[in-house]
Amino acid sequence: MTVETFHPKQTTTLETPAKTLEAASADSVNTGNVATGNRIGFVSLGCPKNLVDSERILTQLRIDGYEVTNSYDNADLVIVNTCGFIDAAVEESLDAVREALEENGKVIVTGCLGAKENQIREVHPDVLEITGPHSYEAVLKHVHKYVPKPEHNPFTSLIPQTGVKLTPKHYAYLKISEGCDNRCTFCIIPALRGDLDSRGAGSVLDEAKRLVEAGVQEILVVSQDTSAYGKDKGGRTDFWNGMPVKQDITSLARQLGKMGAWVRLHYIYPYPWVDDLIPLMAEGLILPYLDIPMQHASPRILKMMKRPGRVDRQLEAIQRWREICPDLVIRSTFIVGFPGETEEDFEMLLDFLREARLDRVGCFKYSEVEGAVANTIAELISEEVKEDRYHRFMEVQAEISAERLARFVGRTMDILIDDVDEEGAIGRSFADAPEIDGMVFINGETELEPGMLVRAVITHSDEHDLWAELVDADAEDEVEA
């Protein structure tokens, strides 16, 4: 049994890629007896959370007997799953809708931007239907309206238990909740996706088990607010495999860590109970990797953002975490040019970077998001100043990142292979999340395959990536684990 394969096409406006369907050869794709005239094109934009929504829609389309195509010309209808978080993402989404309309003419829009139907209709009045984010049933209902459900034999067009995936076979995103209870002034996600709505722990663990049984070697846990998982459950316990499981992020992470795959946590809000996750990393249950967006370091700006404002406590926490788990890799994101940000505020941010010594850092220039409170709370910063601060920020962090990566030189590490080309293999260590962090290059090793987990000694580094050589299995006992 085979299904279509999806490959990333990197965008320039987002940290995560658009996903489009790549055609597989006729002899490698089993479409069963899906009738022609029932082909659906699909474009997925935005973050990994949106990617999971796309996977769910695509899975149901295949279950219903539709064929998914990579060609606008061959599609009877095109679905565009949009992002609407920042202006650049909105522009990209509207461009994708425009292209689909020009190339095909029959388009359904869903996703975060779909929550702003009037904005889409003003630009693209010919769109057939518009739904908001995680509106799976509504999307399928609209598809059935314009392209009737085909007659098909479900036994000849089987779908894996894991469903259709837009990621390579060896890693997958696992979304554990929807929405967010925080009200950061620069963000409109709660308005688009609602308040926190956690999945039951049993459901999450069932999905994770299916992924691992299907060969997934890395599970990337995502949500709008991962560390808040279960807060909305009121302390209720769920059950999995007949065992009670507390519905909080620490208990969930502990159970995920027992499944034998890498477990990587993303989008961790800096709640006090994040401390409880670090021992799990030190024990090796989950990867020693913490994606914790801090956004700024000026107490004044953090207060305006409605974010935790005790930077001294954050620095103390980072030191405490590293003492418990010395291998810990911390990734964060920050905003420069937030309304009202002074040069003094920005210098506080640079000072924080120099003291915190974070491993992986992303930086965004503040973008006015329609409906965000932050747009009107203080004077907007000019584009010239934002650009200058962005480059100064990245220059400081590049030096820090180079220093942090250099500590791996000489170490032997597990490397998960993502790709192999004529020059060798490209993989990632525990320190590297796919698509947003660096890579590990193993030159000359063209016989490796994606999904392999190999041992390699790190030979050198720069501010982004590592280079390595495979370790002789016979010498494994002589090298550092």
UniProtKB/Swiss-Prot annotation:
Entry binding sites for [4Fe-4S] cluster 2: 180, 184, 187
Cofactor note: Binds 2 [4Fe-4S] clusters. One cluster is coordinated with 3 cysteines and an exchangeable S-adenosyl-L-methionine.
Keyword DNA repair found: no
Record keywords, A-Z: 4Fe-4S, Cytoplasm, Iron, Iron-sulfur, Metal-binding, S-adenosyl-L-methionine, Transferase
The protein's required cofactors: [4Fe-4S] cluster
Record's subcellular location: Cytoplasm
A matching Pfam family: Radical_SAM
Ranges for domain TRAM: 406-472
BP-aspect Gene Ontology terms: tRNA modification
Binding site for [4Fe-4S] cluster 1: 47, 83, 112
Domain Radical SAM core: 166-403
Annotated GO CC locations: cytosol
Known catalytic reactions: L-aspartate(89)-[ribosomal protein uS12]-hydrogen + (sulfur carrier)-SH + AH2 + 2 S-adenosyl-L-methionine = 3-methylsulfanyl-L-aspartate(89)-[ribosomal protein uS12]-hydrogen + (sulfur carrier)-H + 5'-deoxyadenosine + L-methionine + A + S-adenosyl-L-homocysteine + 2 H(+)
Known EC number: 2.8.4.4
Entry superkingdom: Bacteria
GO molecular function: 4 iron, 4 sulfur cluster binding; aspartic acid methylthiotransferase activity; metal ion binding; protein methylthiotransferase activity
All copies of domain MTTase N-terminal, residue ranges: 38-148
Homology family: Belongs to the methylthiotransferase family. RimO subfamily.
Functional summary from the UniProt entry: Catalyzes the methylthiolation of an aspartic acid residue of ribosomal protein uS12.
Name of the protein: Ribosomal protein uS12 methylthiotransferase RimO
Species of the source: Shewanella oneidensis (strain ATCC 700550 / JCM 31522 / CIP 106686 / LMG 19005 / NCIMB 14063 / MR-1)
Gene: rimO
